[in-house]
């Protein structure tokens, strides 16, 4: 039996059927294809534009970022996030300097309704662009995924440890603490339903 931390994603195959993709936790990120400046930016948690090789042997430009949880290198082709950046630039009236800064991994802080709002490229977000109420420091500190300590499903519960890792516990293995948390969660959900 081999146990290893990993992330997984459900994807749809070309034939329309679902499949599971696993991303194991690596000891370190494979950064040898990036120059020293790019490696520094990636290790600082920034999304950068770099050349990537495709499955068919071609090269293209993509936004690249390290997934801190697995140390895997993620990438998204530049046109996908580029379109989202273009829409953002039009809505927020951003100039080329602001857009270029974001393309180089720097979050941008704006004032909206007298409050600071920070936006930047983050490949963890489904649009590739993440917003945060607050300054750039808060944007950098904000967790990429927000989960409760306990996330209950139909037959079990995902439990988050102090390091942000999730472990699945089937109902048969619930402790008294988990049963109590499930009752509290049900009460909160019931109360929220009454106030709608």
Residue ranges and their predicted role:
Residues 22-25, 54-196:
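A eukaryote-biased signal for long
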Residues 6-8, 46-48, 62-64, 119:
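One face of beta-strands
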Residues 1, 43-51:
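Short, hydrophobic/aromatic-rich segments at coil-to-beta transitions
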Residues 10-14, 66-68:
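Short, low-complexity Ser/Thr-rich regulatory SLiMs
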Residues 5-7, 16-37, 72-76:
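Beta-strand-dominated lipid-handling architectures at cellular/organellar boundaries
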Residues 31-32, 41, 66, 81:
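Intrinsic-disorder-associated interaction segments
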Residues 10-11, 38-41, 51-56, 98-100:
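Tandem-repeat/low-complexity and Cys-motif detector
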Residues 1-12, 181, 188:
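N-terminal intrinsically disordered, low-complexity leader regions
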């Amino acid at each position: 039996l081999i146990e290893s931390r990993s992330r997984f994603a459900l994807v749809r195959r070309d034939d329309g059927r679902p499949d599971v993709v696993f991303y194991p936790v690596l000891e370190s990120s494979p950064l040898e294809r990036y120059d020293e400046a790019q490696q520094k930016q990636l290790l600082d948690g920034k999304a950068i534009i770099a050349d990537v090789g495709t499955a068919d042997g071609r090269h293209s430009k993509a936004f690249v970022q390290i997934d801190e949880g697995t140390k895997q290198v993620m990438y998204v082709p530049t046109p996908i996030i580029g379109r989202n950046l273009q829409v953002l630039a039009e809505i927020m009236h951003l100039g080329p300097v602001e857009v270029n800064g974001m393309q180089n991994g720097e979050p941008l802080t704006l004032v909206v309704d007298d409050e600071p709002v920070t936006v930047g490229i983050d490949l963890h977000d489904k649009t590739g662009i993440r917003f945060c109420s607050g300054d750039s420091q808060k944007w950098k500190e904000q967790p990429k995924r927000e989960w409760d300590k306990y996330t209950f499903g139909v037959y079990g519960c995902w439990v988050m440890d102090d390091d942000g890792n999730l472990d699945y516990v089937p109902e048969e293995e619930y402790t008294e603490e988990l049963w109590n948390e499930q009752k509290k969660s049900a009460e909160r959900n019931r109360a929220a339903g009454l106030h709608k």
